Amino acid sequence: MLHLMNKIILKPGKDRSVFRYHPWIFSGAIAKTEGKLQEGDLVRVYSSDNQYLATGHYQIGSIAVRILTFEDEEIGYSFWLQRITAAYHMRRAIGLTDRADNDTFRLIHGEGDNLPGLVVDYYAGVAVVQFHSVGMYLERGNITRALLETLGDRLTAIYDKSESTLPYKAAIDPHNGYLYGKADHFVAQENGLKFNVDWLEGQKTGFFIDQRENRHLLEKYAGNKQVLNMFCYTGGFSFYAMRGGARSVHSVDVSTRAIELAKQNVALNFPGDRRHEAFAEEAFRFLEQSHNKYDLI
C-alpha cells in the first residue's frame, strides 16, 4: 500500500477518463488538492466520492498528473525495474533486440510503456535518456539503476539529454551528461544500414528512431524514383531510398552539421554512389529556387 499525504480529488464525472486508463489528469478536472504539492511529487488521485483511482507525478500546467499506475502500489525501485524490464522483454519478443542487422531501438516510449515523461533510445550499448517531466527527472537514480540491471553487459553508457525537454519553469537546473560510463560517437545500425549517432549535439537523442518503419516503407516505394528529403537531418530517409533503388536523392536541411552527417551516412552505406546530393539550405528557399521535378517528397 502506498501512503502519501499528497492527494487530488476530482470533480464529479471527471473520473471517466481514468476508468478508461487515460494516462493524464487535466487541471480542469481537479476539485481540490490536499497536502503541499510541489512539481514532480507523487500524488494519489481520488474520485469525488473518495475512491482511489491512480498514482502519478504532479506537474504545473494543463496536464496536472501523469499517471504511473492505476493500482494502489508502492512506487519504489522495484516498480521502476518491473516497468523497464517489461519494456525490454516486449522489444525482444517482437524482434528488435539481438539482431545482426539492428543494434538500435526505442527502449522506453513514454505512455506507451506506462512510463509517461520518459524516453530511452538504445544505440549499440548506449542508452540515451530524455526526461519530459520533473517527476521522472527526480527518479533518474532509480531509472539508471533499473536500466543497468535490465540490460546488464549490453550497456556501456547512459547519457541524460534532458536540458531541452524539461519544463522551462521547473525549479531545477538539468545538465546534459553521462549518468553511467562514457562513450564516443560511433556508428550504429538499423535494418542493415549504418549511421553516425551524435547524441551530444544532435537533435532528439541523436537519431529519429521512431521513424524506423516509415523509412523502411519509403524504401519499398523508392525504386527508380527521384526523391527529395526535406528537413533531412542526418539523412535517414535518404539512404533507405537509395537502397530501395531511387534514381536520385536530394537531401535538404538548414543545419550544416546535419548535412555533413547526412553525407557521411550516405558514404558509409553507398561509397562512391553519385545518386545523392546534399544541400545546406533553408527548405522553402530551396523549393523556390529548384527547377527539379520529384516523384517522392
What are these regions (language model features)?
Residues 180-297:
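Rossmann-like S-adenosyl-L-methionine
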Residues 108-121, 140-208, 216:
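Non-catalytic substrate-recognition/targeting regions of SAM-dependent transferases
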